[in-house]
């Protein structure tokens, strides 16, 4: 998990330095990575089920998790990570990423492409297929290849190295 957090922090920092806000980030439920603050998340979602503070690449970060009754409809768990390096410096109160763990059947490949269009890239992580959107959305599918396992929203980013682009 720590490696994923570092990788995400690195990608977000690289995207902000290279692309300094040229594309809008994908948002979900009023939460937009790179724009929304802790105070706004709390006003939208209320008090989280649990929180955790951690250090990522020397920065103090925080994670808020909304589960069960506190999670949005159709979602098992909503995880919001705070702490983002921006062109003007580190912002500990800014949303770095937003991760949705949907309930089975809530999303599938068809609903993803209907809602977000064709992905900028597709790939495989072990046995798991994923879609990448340059606006900052990563969609990982269940091992059956159809249902959605997780959706992670980040600020806009370049495709991961080696990600094939759709034809």
Q: Which residues does each PLM region occupy?
A:
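A cross-family detector of function-defining hotspots
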Residues: 36-167
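Structural signature of transmembrane alpha-helix termini at the membrane-water interface
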Residues: 18-21, 52
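Positively charged n-region of N-terminal signal peptides that target proteins for export
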Residues: 1-6
